[in-house]
């Protein structure tokens, strides 16, 4: 997609994946997944979001065409040689709880979210669930955002608590599910 000569209103940084999902209602293989994919799709109903992520050269053209049809600015989408990030999981009946069966980071393992210049003045930033050091790397590239939202998960709470605390101190809103909130705070009565 061509980059307009203006700032992007919303920048979303996160994963772009091919997911294989099992639910009590059925299974799907290699469907579009990832925090950046879904957040950009949702934001596209209101604005033209800027996507920051990485995919391999095996990323389906149909998925990229979907991003085009939704008006998602892809100046921050890196397409590199290798395989796209893949995740496989199973959801319980209530769809609140999931179990990861397999994670293949592939090209996502070497992802460094370097923002195009047109994204750096964005007033609204969503930092998807990625390593908090990478979230901080993004924050260091943005000039005076109005509002920053970050997502995290149990993995980062355990393996990167100092970086996570540093990142949290720089955002306006943190998204956690109930089990992550318990894990992070150490409180079981929320």
Q: Residue locations for each model-derived region?
A:
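Short beta->alpha connector loops
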Residues: 56-57, 129-134, 153-157
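Structural detector of well-ordered beta-strand residues that form the stable sheet scaffold
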Residues: 11, 126, 148-149, 175
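Conserved N-terminal subdomain of the carbohydrate kinase-like
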Residues: 4-9, 18-30, 45-127, 140-145
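Active-site metal-binding loops of divalent metal-dependent hydrolases
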Residues: 14-16
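Active-site glycine-rich loop that binds ribose-phosphate moieties when present
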Residues: 105-114, 133, 155-163
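Conserved phosphate/ATP/ADP-binding segment of small-molecule kinases
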Residues: 143-147, 154-190
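Histidine-anchored nucleotide/phosphate-binding helix
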Residues: 34-44, 139
